[in-house]
Amino acid sequence: MLSSHYQGTPYDPYASYGARENRGVYRSIGINRNDFVALIQLRPDLPADLQAVEWVAYASNALNAMVPFYANVETTPAYLAGTTGEVSTDSFYWVSRMIAAMADASYGKSVFHVERYELRVLSACRALLNQ
């Protein structure tokens, strides 16, 4: 839902079909102007220390991948926590921003690769959570 950009309608700003004047008429949620999104997942069937998971993603919601964080952790791997003002591929934040910037400029050619990346990240994260 938070990555919606009116896919399949004449109002999709990334569409290559329909009347050009309709594209982007309505501001969609999933545009490359977002910077951060978080969702809280509560799993009451698990032990208390595993129940709350915060899923976080950076950059455009239409072009990002969410990763989970347990609510009760004290440290985070550097790749996920080490965000600085210097652009680097050593930071999940900056990688997410770079993917969004490049894919936004060539959406039609890039969306397939971005969707595969999103699914692989989600699958790997779910596997970690289910260990």
Briefly describe each language-model feature range.
Residues 1-131:
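C-terminus-biased signal that marks the final domain/tail of proteins
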